[in-house]
Amino acid sequence: MPRNQGFSDPEYSAEYSAEYSVSLPSDPDRGVGRTHEISVRNSGSCLCLPRFMRLTFVPESLENLYQTYFKRQRHETLLVLVVFAALFDCYVVVMCAVVFSSDKLAPLMVAGFGLVLDIILFVLCKKGLLPDRVSRKVVPYLLWLLISAQIFSYLGLNFSRAHAASDTVGWQAFFVFSFFITLPLSLSPIVIISVVSCVVHTLVLGVTVAQQQQDELEGMQLLREILANVFLYLCAIIVGIMSYYMADRKHRKAFLEARQSLEVKMNLEEQSQQQENLMLSILPKHVADEMLKDMKKDESQKDQQQFNTMYMYRHENVSILFADIVGFTQLSSACSAQELVKLLNELFARFDKLAAKYHQLRIKILGDCYYCICGLPDYREDHAVCSILMGLAMVEAISYVREKTKTGVDMRVGVHTGTVLGGVLGQKRWQYDVWSTDVTVANKMEAGGIPGRVHISQSTMDCLKGEFDVEPGDGGSRCDYLDEKGIETYLIIASKPEVKKTAQNGLNGSAVPNGAPASSKPSSPALIETKEPNGSAHASGSTSEEAEEQEAQADNPSFPNPRRRLRLQDLADRVVDASEDEHELNQLLNEALLERESAQVVKKRNTFLLTMRFMDPEMETRYSVEKEKQSGAAFSCSCVVLFCTAMVEILIDPWLMTNYVTFVVGEVLLLILTICSMAAIFPRSFPKKLVAFSSWIDRTRWARNTWAMLAIFILVMANVVDMLSCLQYYMGPYNMTAGMELDGGCMENPKYYNYVAVLSLIATIMLVQVSHMVKLTLMLLVTGAVTALNLYAWCPVFDEYDHKRFQEKDSPMVALEKMQVLATPGLNGTDSRLPLVPSKYSMTVMMFVMMLSFYYFSRHVEKLARTLFLWKIEVHDQKERVYEMRRWNEALVTNMLPEHVARHFLGSKKRDEELYSQSYDEIGVMFASLPNFADFYTEESINNGGIECLRFLNEIISDFDSLLDNPKFRVITKIKTIGSTYMAASGVTPDVNTNGFTSSSKEEKSDKERWQHLADLADFALAMKDTLTNINNQSFNNFMLRIGMNKGGVLAGVIGARKPHYDIWGNTVNVASRMESTGVMGNIQVVEETQVILREYGFRFVRRGPIFVKGKGELLTFFLKGRDRPAAFPNGSSVTLPHQVVDNP
């Protein structure tokens, strides 16, 4: 049983392992733990071949796909073989027409009929008029039979009077080799039909010629000639097999590159799509598109901007919904922090589904508050109706939490209609938000509402057109802001029947009585997948409603709808369906290969007609560099050709010593060239200097061409020297008269020296490292040298050969007539009385026809090589474009979520109820607000409806963000901005135990090392104050920061897997928020525990005293005033503040 050999097998040579080492990509960052590898098994049906030449892909399905691809690629070369056959028919027609007589009519008609068949077959195959099965299964064998019939017809009809063992042997060897390079069949059938053709041809010639022999001496000569024929055929078969192997190896490499490129492209597209979906779940598409456009600008364009880019847009006539959980404090007391976050995650995931169904754009989640907007970014006439239906559904959904927790929690919902300014502020941790007076009103509508009811304003009421029953809301009695503004409010009672009809038309019938969607009622208690403190996930169940989600995606165009595609992650995970996935991937690969094969990529790229070189010099240079380098197999073919050439010449003329000398010298020289060419392929087996020299030849075009020319020159010179030596040996002592007897040697059958020249043409074709123009030059060298010898130096030899052949084979009267003809100048072939064209001309024409055929094939191979190169370039460019888009999307995503969190959500599709969370024991939290910005903000026309005020706030927040680029603040993470409040935390890193400093556990560190990040956070707060001072000095404003800080443990995580919102929760966060809200402008307020730690780092404090904090009672607080010792920054420098004005001395 054959051994299954992978890429790392030491017996598998470096050449092949390098070319087939295609380990398909895995992405460790995305949690893909499996790599897709394709192994190559050294097995096959043609067991007579060496083991390393029997290549088969594993699995079998991939091998079958490759065989289809390979035969499809070879199908076009089938047309090349048809052209070869047509050229042979043209040759026969010319040879018969030149010396036309009655006995030439039969071969002439057969050749003409064959030529017509070749043309018809060419048209049918070229136009694709034949069924695919016939074209691939029948036509190759039909063409083989047609060519064989033409050769035997020419042999039997044209040489009927004087058969010789060398008749049509050159053409037979030519077509045998052509079968290997053109037929779209597996290697085994080609070997079989080639052997059958050669055996039949040899038997026919042997039997026919043997019947004409007159003595035993002629029988020995016939045996040597038959053996010479065998060596010619053997050479054609061996070199043909090597050619097939080299083509197979090249196509396997191209096939694997195509498969790898497809998987990489699919991988990149999938990741890019995931990033885009994640991005669009956080940001509206119009904002994300604008951000991507700006990110692609070069730095010079960005430097010309006077202000930081702000993505802010005005949206009028939208409905704003605020919803708050009533009784959240009671709920917090009944649950641990992690249980509370789980519960919120599940509840808000339900809200996100409802938001998708009712065309809402969720804006933010602020603790237990959820707010969204309808009519943004795309305007809807029924925005108010949708928002109210959303509110009713949320009230219904909270009943599940009430039943599960046995608490009195409820939802208080407020809706207001008006104008908002929507966008993002700052340069880091982007979150979409809205600002306007109407947003404030909507917030107050929620605050002044009643639990379990939907509270709406007069402006929302005006948009309902009486579609809901309402009652007075009396919101002013519960909210001073509403009372001061004189806003009339209402409470929704129930929907009228018309609303159901509207819901059915606009929401696809998703509403039920009381306005609550049926899907909001839980079918079973939901169990949540969460991450433990070590970051590992565990799943305890799911109630993800996939059908509802798909319906919501179909109903809401703004909801991210991922494209249907084959997911590589699923390929890695779904073990049960592995074979089905492999089939699907192979099908996609086949479609991709068909698509690129049908594209005329070479025609699209400007190339010169004659040379086929690219008109673009840079493209031509790239092609030259990437062109297939020297192949050991190609130079090995030259060695095989020279060996068979020597055997043929020795068999024909065993007494000529020059044959032996040229063989030994030529083989030594060719072995030197072969070893030098293989040193770069097997660097471990050769000295370093030789490897370096071989590599230099590979890299240099002119050196490669020179090396190839040397090989062909050696073959040509060996043949030329042997021909001239033979001529001198046999022609010198004798006087050339018609009646002279010759003693064998080249004089008996000089055609064989032309046949070995055909082998030199075959060796030229095998030089894959040179262009078709170089091959044409070398083939002209071979053909020109043989032509010169045939027509000049060897002219007497061929004349004597024809003279003796016709004299011996015919009757005395016919022989006398032919001798008279041969003795006249009519030997040039123009005299119609000659039975055959003189051998010196027929052999010369044969060489030119074969050279022309091989040149046509070389152009085809060159075109194929350039096509493969362009495919590779296009795939590379396509991957670069996808990668570039992925890079920008990734930059956006990681600017909205921490990198380790984004990586988690890009790994695979998450359920809405799935929770990502991590616990941290020792972190710092900071809130920094601009209390007097509210006085600065106005929506007057002079401020462009408030946009210019927000532009100034954007500059402030952007400058705060730019501080985070300093390496000193690498452990500080911006959490979010809430209006004009900036929230950040320190030590929130993926590693729970180390907080990102070292790999050692916290038990191994001192308190000062463990809390260094808290000191950095305090430095960051001081830097923010300095930054704001610089801004005030330049803008003549007097903004002041009110900052609160605290330290302790938190739970960090993401609520909503499909629309992720990253935040931190816990008592530490609550206290930090209270430190800010109860603080004093211009100061940083901390509690006593935080003050004790920060004192160790040289920070100065002033005692404020006990203050009352809601939910905590009285707390002793301190104001941080500065630092005695300056912070140690890299290179001893201090923080470079944005907008800092440096006075020059």
Curated annotation (Swiss-Prot):
Disruption phenotype: Mutant mice are born at the expected Mendelian rate, but up to 80% of the pups die within 48 hours after birth. Survival is improved by paring down the litter size shortly after birth. Mutant mice are initially smaller than wild-type, but achieve normal size within three months. Mutant mice do not display the normal electrophysiological responses to odorants that stimulate production of cAMP or inositoltrisphosphate (IP3). Likewise, behavorial responses to smells are abolished. In spite of normal mating behavior, they do not produce any offspring. Glycans are attached at residue 735. ATP binds at residues 324-329, 366-368, 412, 976, 1063-1065, 1070-1074, 1110. Specifically activated by the G alpha protein GNAL/G(olf) in signaling cascades triggered by odorant receptors. Activated by forskolin. After forskolin treatment, activity is further increased by calcium/calmodulin. In the absence of forskolin, calcium/calmodulin has little effect on enzyme activity. This is Adenylate cyclase type 3. Its cofactor is Mg(2+); Mn(2+). GO terms for cellular component: ciliary membrane; cilium; Golgi apparatus; membrane; plasma membrane. The gene is Adcy3. The chain crosses the membrane at residues 80-100, 105-125, 139-159, 173-193, 226-246, 381-401, 632-652, 663-683, 707-727, 753-773, 774-794, 834-854. Its EC number is 4.6.1.1. It is a multi-pass membrane protein. Mg(2+) 1 binds at residues 324, 368. It is found in: Cell membrane; Cell projection, Cilium; Golgi apparatus; Cytoplasm. One of its GO terms (biological process) is cellular response to forskolin. The keyword Nucleotide-binding applies. There is a cross-link at residue 465 (Glycyl lysine isopeptide (Lys-Gly) (interchain with G-Cter in SUMO3)). Residues 516-526, 535-544 have a biased composition (Low complexity). Catalyzes the formation of the signaling molecule cAMP in response to G-protein signaling. Participates in signaling cascades triggered by odorant receptors via its function in cAMP biosynthesis: specifically activated by G alpha protein GNAL/G(olf) in olfactory epithelium. Required for the perception of odorants. Required for normal sperm motility and normal male fertility. Plays a role in regulating insulin levels and body fat accumulation in response to a high fat diet. Residues 1-79, 402-631, 855-1145 are cytoplasmic. It comes from the Eukaryota. SUPFAM superfamilies: Nucleotide cyclase. The modification Phosphoserine is found at residues 524, 579, 1077. Pfam families: AC_N, Guanylate_cyc. Keywords: ATP-binding, Calmodulin-binding, cAMP biosynthesis, Cell membrane, Cell projection, Cytoplasm, Glycoprotein, Golgi apparatus, Isopeptide bond, Lyase, Magnesium, Manganese, Membrane, Metal-binding, Nucleotide-binding, Olfaction, Phosphoprotein, Repeat, Sensory transduction, Transmembrane, Transmembrane helix, Ubl conjugation. N-glycosylated. Rapidly phosphorylated after stimulation by odorants or forskolin. Phosphorylation by CaMK2 at Ser-1077 down-regulates enzyme activity.
